[in-house]
Amino acid sequence: MSRRRAHDTEDEGYDHRRNKRRRVSENQEIEDRLESLILRVGERSTSSVESNLEGLVSVLEADLGTFRLKILRILSDCAVRMPEKCTVYTTLVGLLNAKNYKFGGEFVDHMVKTFKESLKMCRWDAARYSLRFLADLVNCHVISATSLLQLLDTMIDVSNEDTVPQVRRDWFVFAVLSTLPWVGRDLYEKKESALESLLLRIEVYLNKRSKKHHNALRVWSSDAPHPQEEYLDCLWAQIRKLRQDNWAEKHIPRPYLTFDTILCEALQHNLPQIIPPPHNDAFVYPMPWVVYRMFDYTDCPDGPNLPGAHSIERFLIEEHLHHIIETYHHERKDCAAQLLSFPFKHKIPLEYCIVEVIFAELFHMPTPRYLDICYGSILIELCKLQPATLPQVLAQATEILFMRIDSMNTSCFDRFVNWFSYHLSNFKFTWSWDEWDSCLLLDGEHPRPKFIQEVLQKCLRLSYHQRITEMMPTTYGKLIPQVPVPNFKYASEEAASLPGTAVAHQLVVAIRQKCSPEEVVNILKEIPNSGYSGEEMSDGTFNALKIDVFVQTLLNLGSKSFSHSFAAISKFHSVFRALAETEEAQICVLHNIYELWSSHQQMMVVLVDKLLKLQIVDCSAVATWIFSKEMTSEFTKMYLWEILHLTIKKMNKHVIKLNTELSVAKDKLSKADSSSSESDEDAPTKRKKPITHADKPSEEAVERMEEKLEAANVNQKRLFLIVFQRFIMILSEHMLRSDTDGRDPDTDWYRWTIGRLQQVFLMHHEQVQKYSSTLETLLFTSDLDTHILEVFQQFVALRA
């Protein structure tokens, strides 16, 4: 072979590889272009949606041979991820089906697979959007109405299942009901009797289902002026109204109507039989909710009318706005812009709809989807983008909330306080306070003055005391927070008569001279083991005076800032641990922090959090301290419950962390064992990567992890038992006293306390649920007062 020919062969090989790379690159470019075209179809452009669709159909039809799988995947993804463009994509699929029946069948199969997979994986929203898409394909003559009705009937069959949670049955009924606005008209025209039969089955189920959970999820206890409807009841009323209107709605864009002459000639596909996966105890279903209403048409100025509470348009608008928030909540500026670009904004009072939906999210029970600050930041961006109208609507909403605050759920009260204080801090703390001065005549425990007091406390965290004083009218003096300074009793006028003053002064000098923890311990030894708080020392386990002197002196010296306090606690961590070995001693530490910092709520919160992190105090000690007699005057203040919830969350996170670590370790152990046995069997034929000792946890290590998790679960259960037992005790005492004195027990204090009990159940429902049977056996027994017992029963009903 000549050198010339060899050189030519090498060139040919190089050219072949280069051409292959070019083909791959070109294919990728075409795929990216197709994806971009499909994703952007129907969005704003100079041409209409219909002409966009016609052009896209021509492009896709030409590329079906090469990029069929890619197109199938993109379209099915769009169906789930972009439900607001459902009818645009169903029209696109309908036009492709009219031109290529085989592709239409493949897409239906792909969509059915997506639907079944979503149900199996408990992706409930994705399943609902898939069902809606399949239903809308009936309008595009892709799927037969008969086969869709069979699927809907099969889903309603779930409502007759026995021994399954009601939340499972509820979801399947909700999925069917929420699909009917898209396909109801077509089913009414083609299969009216079958549709009526389906609706009758739904009505039978709705009439017999339990709604014990309803009151726990209400934002307001009163139904005036707007009823707080349970979500399925509300949607059912909207569907009945739609049926009365012959299934004619005015909100859903239906581009397929333009192509009716083309689509009606296409052959249709039948859906295969789809059986919902049976219930599994590991399945977590969506919890029920209450439909939030703040405005009606009388609240809106001249312009487009707000659809009625039972019009299907209200449901469709709200669902669309909720989905925009879900899609863009990570970026507040984009979210605000998308909300204000709502496609039907000229047909509705958009600002009112947006504000109502955002507050619906913020006040969603048992917990909002996102952090409170997420909604606050979106509202601020909306005010910036729409300064002429949105601030006025928001002010109107705030006024409505304040006027209805008397019957507001306690959890929602807290969220309202947090939002309003944050909002004020972004707008120079400007508000027309004079309009609310009638609340000054009310009792301090009444929700209105309490709201203003709590708002000012939160504003203090975001500003400084003088600023708060300057922004408020002088008439509000009694609601303005105290100046947040430490009350160091060993420097007061009465200090000379207090035991421990001399040691406290000695300690001040030593700490300022940067003494060691050991030196502090030696100084504290000068305090005798008796003669102070004899009741607490009866068991001889701790010295209350030592704790008093040490805690108050150290934290007073660190009072300049949070950082100074943290540094002081960290440096003398060993002294804290030595003094606070028992729960009683830890409660004594907490009480002394309160005595020093009673005028600074935020300092109290961060210091308790720090003590928990450093394991100086246990979660159970914090819970017991909160319910102690010394804290009676603080019992209805928000910061105390902030401390309780951060304590419970810390315990919950610890349990979840240990649970995750154990699961990972067990998984590694089982994989290592199976890998080892497989490699033994395959040794002659196959070499495997060896399992190192570091990768595989020992069985002893796993056992230790199990023991740690078991101990953590015991501590968590004990914490919940302490909290709920204390609630029952103080509420039962209140009921008994009221009965003895012949007074109405329904006082402001009672409503706050029962609200806090409900808040603990709902805020930590996932963890509390594990112990519901224990709680029922030990605490929430049938002989308990019905008002207290009802809170527990409502909680249990959420997952029933």
From Swiss-Prot:
- Location in or out of the cell: Nucleus
Cite the InterPro entries for this sequence. ARM-type_fold (IPR016024), CBP80 (IPR027159), MIF4G-like_typ-1 (IPR015172), MIF4G-like_typ-2 (IPR015174), MIF4G-like_typ-3 (IPR003890)
Q: Is Nucleus one of the keywords?
A: yes
Paired cysteines (S-S): none
Q: Where in this protein does the record put region Disordered?
A: 1-26, 669-704
Domain MIF4G, residue spans:
31-243
Q: Name one GO biological process term.
A: negative regulation of viral genome replication
Q: Where is the composition biased (Basic and acidic residues)?
A: 692-704
Q: Does the keyword Plastid apply?
A: no
Q: Domain of life, per the record?
A: Eukaryota
Please list the GO terms describing molecular function.
mRNA binding; RNA cap binding
| Keywords recorded for this protein, A-Z | mRNA capping, mRNA processing, mRNA splicing, Nucleus, Phosphoprotein, RNA-mediated gene silencing
The cellular component terms of Gene Ontology attached to this UniProt record, alphabetical and capped at eight, are: nuclear cap binding complex; nucleus; postsynaptic cytosol; presynaptic cytosol
Q: Which residues carry this modification: Phosphothreonine?
A: 9
Assembly and partners? Component of the nuclear cap-binding complex (CBC), a heterodimer composed of Cbp80 and Cbp20 that interacts with m7GpppG-capped RNA.
Q: Per its database record, what is this protein's job?
A: Component of the cap-binding complex (CBC), which binds cotranscriptionally to the 5'-cap of pre-mRNAs and is involved in various processes such as pre-mRNA splicing and RNA-mediated gene silencing (RNAi). The CBC complex is involved in miRNA-mediated RNA interference via its interaction with Ars2 and is required for primary microRNAs (miRNAs) processing. Also involved in innate immunity via the short interfering RNAs (siRNAs) processing machinery by restricting the viral RNA production.
Name the family the entry cites.
Belongs to the NCBP1 family.
Q: What is this protein called?
A: Nuclear cap-binding protein subunit 1
- Native source organism of the sequence: Drosophila persimilis
Organismal lineage:
Eukaryota, Metazoa, Ecdysozoa, Arthropoda, Hexapoda
Q: Which gene encodes it?
A: Cbp80
